[in-house]
Amino acid sequence: MNKQRVTLNCDMGESFGNWKMGSDELVMPWVDMANIACGFHASDPSVMSKTVALAKHYKVKIGAHPGYQDLVGFGRRSIPHTPAQISEIVLYQVGALKAVCQYHDVPLHYVKPHGALYNDMMESEAIFRAICEAVSIFGIPLMILATSDNQRYLDIADIYDVPLLFEAFADRQYQEDGKLTPRSQANAVYHQPEDIYNQALQIATYGSVNTANGTRLSLEADTICVHGDNPESITLVQRISQAIAKM
């Protein structure tokens, strides 16, 4: 069993102009960490500022959520970049959110890449190194996917003096190697509240998930990613938060 209570993190600040995404005001009181979009895959300066202020109000730790420059595709399309360009887009976005945090007199606690950039980071050592290099400038941890081989990533991040936070997903199906089932495949995302609730509690209590073929996979995760995109999911986040608080 996990010795330390896992935290809950959620993607936030993903509205853009007149386009509304998520229910940040209703979810924020129930999570520990807010992954705030930085303007490339979603968000804008006003949304970033409002979301930072909301996180400050509820004493939620703030993380930068950089992605590929792809508003139309919501950052879920992989866009070819050189390692140097990866470092530059991460520096640009994290630097912007850090400035917003300074304006609101709150610290920036960590970085968690978004969507396709997150997936590419987990698949490509060159991209992972490029992101570590950028994050090292800020002296804060990088959040990545907990897998069956956390040590591999720890060894690389240590070269850049970047601490790692490992996360697991409450609403995603896992493969035997600890990677997430691609969204292009059936059953990659869980939609039934009880399935999501049960997986979250299994991670929090036993540090494990059941994979696509039914085997149990151990995951050393510090935090669980949840989503609050609709009224039903907001209620679910509340249930998960209350259950973990009792552990």
UniProtKB/Swiss-Prot annotation:
Ribosomal protein recorded as keyword: no
PANTHER family: 5-OXOPROLINASE SUBUNIT A, UNCHARACTERIZED PROTEIN YBGL-RELATED
GO terms (BP aspect): carbohydrate metabolic process
Subunit comment: Forms a complex composed of PxpA, PxpB and PxpC.
InterPro entries, per database record: Glyco_hydro/deAcase_b/a-brl (IPR011330), LamB/YcsF/PxpA-like (IPR005501)
Organismal lineage: Bacteria, Pseudomonadati, Pseudomonadota, Gammaproteobacteria, Vibrionales
UniProt organism field: Vibrio vulnificus (strain YJ016)
HAMAP family the UniProt entry points to: PxpA (MF_00691)
Protein name, UniProt field: 5-oxoprolinase subunit A
Function: Catalyzes the cleavage of 5-oxoproline to form L-glutamate coupled to the hydrolysis of ATP to ADP and inorganic phosphate.
Record's keyword annotation contains Lipoprotein: no
